[in-house]
Structure formats: C-alpha cells, structure tokens
C-alpha cells in the first residue's frame, strides 16, 4: 500500500528547458542549463510529470480537466496483476497532470482578469501590491532564473485586480520593472498547456495571437518548431515567431508591457477623429492608401477591402493611420481637438499601440502589402517626431520587404492594384532618398534601379477609381489628389542622379543639367490650372514645387556627394565659365530661395497641417552659410543673413531628422566661422532689430526674413529644396481642401514663360563647365564640410 501511494504521487521531474526543446537539443537539466548559459538567454526550466506514452497516451481530451469528474476508487478484491498496477500508475500520473493543468489554467485566468482590471483602472498600484509575476519582469539575472522556476501570474496595476490573483502570489515581494520577461512567462504558461491539445480559438479575444500552435509530437510536448501559417487568417501568426523576437530586435516593442498590451486606440470616437486628421494632413502627402476605402472602413464601419474583421494586417494599418495622424498634430491642434497637450502622451501612446500591432502582424515572416503600408506610415510618422537613426535604419527593412513582394516589377493585375502598387513602391523609394539625405549617405536604391523601376501612377483623384475597376483612367489636367505626390516621385528619381554621381566627366555634367531640366518640366506641367489661393493643399503644392525646383538646381551645382575629378587627359577643351563671384551669387540665390520656402511653411498658417513633414534643409543652409561667408557684397549679406539666421535657429530647435550630432556639429562650426567673417561687414546691422548676428535664442526670437514665397502665381518657380522633407498645406482641421477665401477664376498658366525662366541651356552658369576646384574657395569649404560630416559619422561608431 505504501508503494502504491508513492507510485500515485511521484516527485515532479525536471524536464528539458524551453529553449532546448525548441532547438531540439539535449538539455543537461540544470538550472540554468549549459546551453542557455552559452547562448546568453534566460533559461526557462520545466517541472511537470512526464506525459503518458505509447498505448497509455491520451491525445484527445473531450473535456477540460477542470470538469472531469473524479473517478471513484475501485476496491481491490484480490491480488493485483502487473497490468492493473501499470494502469493504476498511469491513471495516477494523469491525475497529477490534470491537477497541474488546472493550476495553470487558473493562473492564465488570473492574468486575463488582472489585465482587464488594469485597462479599466489606469491608476498605478503601490509597489508593495505588485504581484509575483513582476518578479520575472525585474531584478538581476539570478533573480530571474529563480523566479522562472515558479508560476507567473499577471501583473496588476491596481488594487482592484489583486483579488483575482492567488493569495500566495500576492504575498510575494515586488521587483522593479524589466522589459519583456512578463511576456516570456506568459508564453511559458501557454506553451506548457499546449500538450493538452486544447483549442485556443475559444478565447481568441483574450489571446488573439495564440492560435494554430498546438502540435503534439510526443515526449516533451510543445517543442515543435513547425507551426501552421495562414496569410488570410484573421489572427496573428504563431506565437513562437513573436515570442522569439518578431519585430522586437528592430526596437519596435515598447519597454512598458502595459502599453504593448493595452489597446490605446479602443476609443472609437478618438479613432474616428484621428482618421479625419489623417485624411486632411497626411493623405494629401503620402498617397499610399485609397482615400474612399479608408473613409468607408474607419468612418462608416465597413470592412477593409476583402479582409476579415480581425485580420492583424488591418489592425496594424488602423494603428499606423492613428499614429501618423497624431504625429502630424501641432500643439494648438491637439489642444483644440483633444483638450490635451501634445506632450501629454497622445503621440507616444499611438506609437506604442502601432508598434505592438506591427509586431503581432508578423510583418517580417509573412509580409503583405497592407502590412507594408502600415510599416511605411509608421516610419514616416516616426521620422517626423524622432531625431534618432531609427527611421533611417528601418527604411532598409521597408525596401527589402517591398522587393520581396515584387512591388518594383510590372505584372498582369487590375488597374486599382497597379496604381496602389506603384504608389507604394515610389513612396518607399522617396523614403530611401530622404533617409540618405538625413544621414549624408548613399541610398539603398541606386540610380540605375530607380530609373529601371520608375513607372508613374496616373494623375487622377482617388474617387476616380475603386477596387473593382479593371479599365484604365486617363490623366486629369489641373490639381488632383496625387499632384504633389507625383512631383515628389519625379524628384526622388532626379535627386539620385543629381546628388550621387559616379564621375566628373563632361557627359556627367551634361546629364546633371538634363536631369534638373527634365524635373522642372515635369513638375511645372503638373501645375496647370493650379491656383495657390484656392485651398491650403493648392497653396502647399505650388510653393512646395517651387522649393523642389530650386533644390534640384542647387543640387546640380552643389551635390551632396561631389564626384571625383577625372584625370587631366579626359578634360574637354576650355569653355567660357562664370567667375567664382558669379558662381557664388547664383549658389547663394538658389540656397536662399530654398530656405525662404522652408521657413514660410514653418510660419504661414496655411502650412500648419503639413508642418509635421517639413524639416529644415541643412544642405541648402550649409551652402548659404558658405557662400555668404565668402561674399564681399555687404548689401547681399545684409539681405541674406536674416534668412540664414532664422533657418539656423529653426534647425537647432527642430533638429535634423535622423542625425543630430553628425550634421549639426560641423554645421555649427561653419556657422561660427561665417559669423566671425561676416560680422565686420555687418557692423551697421548688428544692432538692428531686424536680426541678431550672434543670437542663439530659440526660433521665436530669431528674425523673420523677408519672403518672396507668398507672391502671386506669376512668381518664379524656384524655391524649395528637394533634399529636405516636403509638405502640403491644410490650414485648419475640419476644412477638407476648402477654399481659404473668395477665389477668382484662374486662367491656364503660361507654362512656356515659366519654363523660359528655367531654361538651363540658356544660362551660362549651368551651360558652362563648373569652375575648377582649386580656383573656387567655396567649393573647398564645401568639401571640408562634407569631410567633417563623414568624420563625425565615423566617430559615432567608435566606443
């Protein structure tokens, strides 16, 4: 009898740890095991009875262990055979397994209850009330290893949820927070229940990502590395892919587990408002979504395309739209719409929710066009509000995913799919170029590839097509939903050729002129019938195109990366060249046009809705500072310096997107030298209230330069730097492309007269050969600046 009791209550064995089971390697079953120590990961030991095998294995259990009635003991009437003893021992082991499974289910229920309570009560719990689950979330390595041997109930953020957690758990001492251990513990709980072959679809609302995971391969069950995959499943990909990193290695997961779990944007009214903001302030610039489809989906509650209701790609896209909208808000807009400041966390919460949704979508392992659209919106929004290199780094992921989906290849598809694919690919190409400028680095998509894959979408409105359309639609004349987007698609192609040349041959210089002229012609052709006073969007499109034209011409003279000069034997016959003084004056004029337009979009009320996308053009600012410091004309310096000073202060305030020190430090030294050289020429203007030569105050204290940017449509179209970010203009929320004031009929613009002003071939500056490097001090100064930026970037990699 004593032996039978011992047989029924065996000691819980120490099985292979989680990582060894997943990797299918032998575990030495120490705590921690040698394999986990060598791999540098947290060892998660497994303590449970061994599963029955062979004829005694019970793979399918029709009832939950919590509802299996207890079996009455069978009286022993005579001698017990060996078969009966073996069956008795097997039933005892199964009973112990049932008890362990029941406890684990109870702990999972406590996890869900505590999280629901945390969503309802945002007040944080006192540190003394935090449950034992956070013991694995915190502490050092030794503490984590010891805690992993225990059970992991859920964290609680309020006293109200403590009642749902076992008493022995509440009494555990707390630890401080550590990023992702809690989710590791929760995954461990679910993984250890998997051997029971339970179907988690019944509780998909609580665990939408735990589905199609249950595969019993015998032995240490739950160690299967092969899981089911269904790209059209409304639920997320398998948990093993998310648990072992997913997008976390890209830095997308937040450090706060509550934020990564809590659906921040569950408020339908808030989501609706953010969608309206997106349609007004983001969609006119970033044309990767179909506006009518988004309106039907997020504003009217219809399904998105043919996706099921809970598809993770659709959830990721919804979160990305809300994040992009929140990032586009100014402080005044945020206060007026949500009655809270922008710094109160609306952008941060939206970003964390978007990151969590992207992680659940399994973008890296099962990419889709919808998921990639969400990722692109995330990168654009993050670049606008984050000065780190994250957006520049993650742009490479977007490029790879786009190529994996074949977005750069033409194929047989419907007209709607073709248009959306082309828009997405060209937007990613534009992001790649913008990221290269922010880091002063080479783009991932080179000029040859960008040219060979360049297929423009149609110049139409989104309302002209729908997902069921099969026939093509001709281009429209006049301002369309895609006008500014098409301008940026043209500039991303010209920008690569203008700034990342490979040779300084005469053929290269001639092609530089051709690229700049071709872009000007294409851009101006898109502006037929465009009245800049008809709407904020038209205002921005007009002035934005001016800025891009000036920026393209500036890049033809001062590319971001200068080509290496060729040997003397290949030099062409000498041709008339402008003097260095004339050259400097033209460079200064173009750079000032760029800066004035950028400053205008940061200050004019009509640009408020698109200001989030505008970054100060450091490339044009560096050229202007260099040329102004070498210019002997006092009147020209006095006219240019207020613009330079105001833009420099704005750059210091806003920062350079993606690279703060590597560009700003050399630029600051260049600015100091320019101030020292220009100050003797500006003694009379030093005390003028118009500007302050040595001011280092914020932008509000900086001078407001005289702007030529707000003039009539007959102005010269040469005022915006394509190397900077671009922006549209919606003046106020709630006015969707509405006229700002009374609009008079505008006749068709005289395109020939506008193009005549930009006839590059008629200008000796661009028609002639660029002056030799040794004869031009400004070029040497520019080369020194680019060398300093490259040196600063290299030093960032050193310890």
UniProtKB/Swiss-Prot annotation:
GO BP of this protein: DNA-templated transcription
Compartment(s) where it occurs, according to its Swiss-Prot or TrEMBL record: Nucleus
Principal place of residence: nucleus
Any coiled-coil regions, as ranges: none
Chain positions covered by the region annotation Disordered: 67-95, 218-237, 561-583, 692-716
This protein's UniProt keywords: DNA-binding, Metal-binding, Nucleus, Transcription, Transcription regulation, Zinc
GO cellular component, one term: nucleus
Disulfide bridge map: none
GO MF terms, alphabetically ordered: DNA binding; DNA-binding transcription factor activity, RNA polymerase II-specific; zinc ion binding
InterPro entries hit by this protein: Sec_Metabolite_Reg (IPR050613), Transcription_factor_dom_fun (IPR007219), Zn2-C6_fun-type_DNA-bd_sf (IPR036864), Zn2Cys6_DnaBD (IPR001138)
PROSITE patterns in the cross-refs: ZN2_CY6_FUNGAL_1, ZN2_CY6_FUNGAL_2
Function: Transcription factor that specifically regulates the neosartoricin biosynthesis gene cluster.
Descriptive protein name: C6 finger domain transcription factor nscR
Protein source organism: Neosartorya fischeri (strain ATCC 1020 / DSM 3700 / CBS 544.65 / FGSC A1164 / JCM 1740 / NRRL 181 / WB 181) (Aspergillus fischerianus)
Lineage, highest ranks first: Eukaryota, Fungi, Dikarya, Ascomycota, Pezizomycotina
């Amino acid at each position: 009898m004593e032996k039978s009791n011992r047989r029924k209550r065996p000691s819980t064995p120490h099985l292979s740890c989680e990582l060894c089971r997943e990797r299918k390697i032998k575990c030495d079953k120490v705590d921690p095991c040698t394999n986990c120590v060598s791999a540098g990961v947290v060892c998660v030991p497994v303590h449970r009875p061994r599963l029955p095998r062979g004829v005694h294995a019970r793979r399918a259990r029709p009832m939950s262990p919590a509802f299996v009635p207890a079996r009455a003991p069978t009286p022993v009437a005579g001698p017990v055979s060996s078969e009966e003893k073996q069956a008795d021992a097997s039933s005892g082991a199964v009973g112990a397994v049932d008890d362990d499974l029941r406890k684990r289910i109870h702990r999972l229920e406590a996890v869900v209850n505590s999280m629901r309570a945390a969503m309802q009560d945002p007040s944080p719990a006192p540190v003394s009330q935090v449950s034992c689950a956070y013991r694995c979330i915190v502490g050092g390595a030794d503490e984590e290893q010891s805690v992993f041997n225990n059970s992991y109930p859920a964290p609680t953020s309020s006293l109200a949820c403590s009642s749902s957690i076992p008493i022995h758990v509440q009494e555990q001492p707390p630890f401080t927070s550590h990023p992702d251990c809690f989710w590791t513990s929760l995954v461990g709980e679910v993984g250890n229940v998997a051997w029971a072959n339970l179907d988690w679809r019944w509780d998909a609302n609580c665990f939408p990502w735990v589905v199609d995971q249950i595969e019993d391969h015998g032995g240490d069950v739950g160690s299967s590395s092969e899981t089911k995959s269904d790209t059209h499943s409304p639920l997320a990909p398998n948990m093993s892919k998310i648990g072992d990193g997913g997008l976390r290695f890209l830095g997308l997961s937040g450090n706060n587990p509550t934020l990564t779990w809590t659906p921040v944007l569950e408020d339908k009214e808030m989501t609706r408002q953010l969608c309206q903001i997106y349609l007004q302030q983001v969609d006119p610039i970033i044309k990767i979504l179909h506006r009518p489809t988004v309106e039907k989906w997020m504003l009217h509650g219809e399904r998105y395309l043919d996706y099921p209701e809970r598809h993770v790609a659709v959830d990721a896209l919804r979160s990305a739209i809300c994040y992009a909208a929140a990032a586009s808000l100014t402080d005044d807009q945020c206060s007026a719409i949500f009655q809270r400041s922008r710094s109160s966390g609306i952008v941060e919460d939206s970003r964390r929710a978007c990151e969590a949704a992207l992680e659940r979508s399994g973008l890296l392992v099962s990419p889709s066009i919808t998921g990639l659209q969400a990722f692109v919106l995330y990168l654009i929004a993050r670049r606008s509000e984050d000065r780190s290199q994250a957006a520049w780094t993650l742009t490479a992921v977007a490029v790879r995913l786009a190529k994996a989906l074949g977005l750069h290849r033409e194929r047989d598809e419907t007209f709607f799919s073709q248009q959306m694919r082309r828009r997405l690919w060209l937007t990613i190409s534009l992001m790649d170029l913008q990221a290269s400028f922010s880091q002063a680095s080479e783009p991932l998509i080179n000029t040859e590839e960008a040219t060979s894959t360049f297929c423009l979408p149609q110049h139409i409105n989104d309302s002209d097509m729908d997902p069921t359309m099969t026939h093509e639609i001709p281009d429209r004349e006049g301002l369309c939903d895609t006008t500014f987007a098409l301008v940026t698609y043209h500039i991303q192609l010209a920008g690569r050729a203008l700034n990342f040349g490979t040779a300084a041959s005469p053929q290269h210089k001639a092609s530089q002129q051709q690229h700049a002229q071709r872009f000007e012609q294409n851009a101006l052709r898109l502006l037929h019938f465009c009245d800049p006073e008809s709407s904020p969007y038209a205002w921005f499109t007009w002035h934005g195109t001016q800025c891009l034209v000036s920026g393209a011409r500036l890049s033809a003279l001062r590319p971001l990366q200068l080509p290496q000069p060729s040997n003397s034997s290949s030099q062409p016959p000498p041709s008339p060249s402008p003097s260095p003084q004339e050259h400097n004056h033209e460079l200064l004029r173009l750079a000032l046009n760029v800066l004035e337009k950028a400053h205008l979009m940061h200050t004019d009320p009509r640009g408020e809705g698109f200001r989030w996308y505008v970054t100060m053009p450091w490339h044009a600012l560096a050229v202007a500072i260099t040329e102004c410091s070498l210019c002997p004309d006092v009147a020209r310096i006095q006219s240019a310096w207020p613009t330079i000073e105001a833009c420099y202060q704005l750059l210091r305030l806003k920062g350079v997107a993606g690279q703060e020190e590597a560009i700003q430090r050399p630029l600051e030294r260049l600015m100091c030298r320019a101030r020292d050289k220009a100050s003797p020429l500006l003694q009379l203007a030093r005390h003028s209230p118009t500007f302050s030569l040595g001011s280092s105050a914020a932008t509000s204290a900086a001078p407001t330069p005289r702007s030529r940017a707000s003039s009539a449509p007959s102005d010269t179209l040469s005022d915006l730097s394509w190397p900077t970010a671009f922006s549209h203009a919606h003046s106020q929320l709630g006015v969707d492309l509405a006229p700002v004031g009374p609009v008079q009929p505008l006749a068709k613009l005289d395109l020939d007269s506008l193009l005549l002003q930009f006839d590059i071939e008629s200008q000796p500056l661009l028609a002639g050969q660029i002056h030799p490097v040794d004869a031009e001090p400004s070029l040497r100064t520019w080369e020194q600046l680019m060398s300093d930026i490259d040196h600063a970037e290299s030093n960032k990699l050193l310890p």
